[in-house]
């Protein structure tokens, strides 16, 4: 990344970050909203009704300020404003790819030192029949997958439920995609959610669960569970919990068919090897031909792309209602891998298809803004110390 490109990404220096003075209500359940209302003196008999009003304004209509909540009394609005906000994460920068993909860099409180801030990225991918939002669950990642750019950034902290749902709300804000606002043909622009951004969702299970329950609530964000996919590298103990407590579609970052290679590509495999992972998939609640598990397989030249690998993959998935997404490797600075040749990807896909599995090849999106699969990483983490210092100096004079 050039210094000029970095300056476009981040105009506000980290030194000027001001932590929020009041807590945001974003990310709270109805019961938690009622509890907070009790803290400011709302009578017990009114809490449930008032909590439902807040819920509808925040998650259905996308209110950005209590003053917008016209069916709430002026006195109550003032009281809410004195104690709380409905703020989302701060949008530091937006990049738009040549193919229409959008990437937002979002700034969050650090969670410990209130004078510092952290960043995450989320990505919106428009298609003719859907609009998919790729959401992050952690600042950084702990898994160190060798082919993944995010894996080169250390894990900083888990996101809260509010910070996860806040990414969805930011996207709807930026796309003008709320119920009361105009969208093309009256349709929503964000139709699908994939937990495939920064971090391992199942190492932040409770916050991810709470956020996705808001996403899939018919009186909230209102996206069907069948349009929400959670991707995991294989945190086996929480796979069954995902089906039981969240009920969304499951995707597995597989990428190898032999434990020895997967140990290298996805080090989590040393803790939860293929046999345990695939058994958890066979036991996943609700899995069927109508609700197939997606297996993601990044195509690495000369590493995992042989026809023998394809044969082993078909054997491994026997008995699992599955589809296989083949992902051309997206290069990033410093990577040791190359993408498989296109002819080899097609041969691999054809073998799997002839064995009875859907095997689409994922079209890379947003490569020019490092928004494609495996490319996400907080921008301030990417910069060298020298570039970061220069960027801050420029921002201070803007």
UniProtKB/Swiss-Prot annotation:
Residues bound to [4Fe-4S] cluster: 141, 145, 148
Residues the entry annotates as binding S-adenosyl-L-methionine: 199-200, 231, 253-255, 330
Enzyme class: transferase
The EC number(s) this enzyme carries: 2.1.1.192
Superkingdom of the organism of origin: Bacteria
GO cellular component: cytoplasm
Described function: Specifically methylates position 2 of adenine 2503 in 23S rRNA and position 2 of adenine 37 in tRNAs. m2A2503 modification seems to play a crucial role in the proofreading step occurring at the peptidyl transferase center and thus would serve to optimize ribosomal fidelity.
Family that this chain belongs to: Belongs to the radical SAM superfamily. RlmN family.
Protein name: Dual-specificity RNA methyltransferase RlmN
Species: Rhodopseudomonas palustris (strain BisB5)
């Amino acid at each position: 990344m050039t210094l000029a490109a970095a300056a476009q990404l981040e105009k506000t220096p980290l030194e000027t970050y001001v932590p929020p003075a009041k807590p945001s209500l974003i990310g709270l359940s109805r019961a938690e909203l009622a509890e907070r209302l009790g803290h400011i003196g709302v009578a017990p008999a009114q809490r449930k009704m008032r909590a439902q009003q807040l819920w509808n304004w925040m998650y259905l209509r996308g209110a950005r300020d209590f003053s917008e909540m016209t069916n709430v009394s002026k006195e109550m609005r003032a009281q809410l404003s004195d104690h709380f906000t409905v703020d989302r994460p701060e949008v530091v920068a937006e990049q738009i790819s040549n193919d229409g993909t959008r990437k937002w860099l979002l700034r969050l409180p650090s969670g410990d030192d209130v004078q510092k801030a952290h960043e995450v990225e989320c990505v919106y991918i428009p298609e003719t029949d859907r609009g998919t939002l790729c959401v992050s669950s952690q600042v950084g990642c702990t898994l160190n997958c060798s082919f993944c750019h995010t894996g080169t950034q250390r894990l900083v902290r888990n996101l809260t439920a509010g910070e996860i749902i806040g990414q969805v709300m930011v996207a709807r804000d930026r796309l003008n995609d709320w119920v009361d606002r105009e969208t093309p043909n009256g349709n929503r622009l964000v139709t699908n959610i994939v937990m495939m951004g920064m971090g391992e969702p199942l190492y932040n299970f409770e916050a991810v669960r709470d956020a996705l329950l808001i996403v899939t609530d018919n009186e909230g964000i209102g996206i069907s569970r069948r349009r929400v996919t959670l991707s995991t590298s294989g945190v086996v103990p929480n796979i069954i919990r995902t089906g039981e407590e969240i009920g969304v579609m499951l995707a597995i970052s597989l990428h190898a068919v032999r434990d020895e290679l997967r140990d290298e590509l996805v080090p989590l495999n040393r803790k939860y090897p293929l046999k345990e992972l695939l058994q958890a998939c066979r036991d996943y609640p609700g899995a069927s031909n109508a609700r197939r598990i997606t297996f993601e397989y990044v195509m690495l030249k000369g590493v995992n792309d042989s026809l023998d690998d394809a044969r082993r993959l078909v054997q491994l998935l026997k008995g699992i209602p599955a589809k296989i997404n083949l992902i051309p490797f997206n290069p990033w600075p410093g990577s040791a891998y190359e993408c498989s040749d296109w002819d080899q990807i097609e041969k691999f896909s054809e073998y799997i298809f002839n064995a009875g599995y859907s095997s689409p090849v994922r079209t890379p999106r947003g490569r020019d803004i490092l928004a494609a699969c495996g490319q996400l990483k907080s921008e301030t983490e990417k910069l060298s110390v020298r570039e970061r210092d220069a960027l801050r100096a420029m921002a201070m004079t803007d």
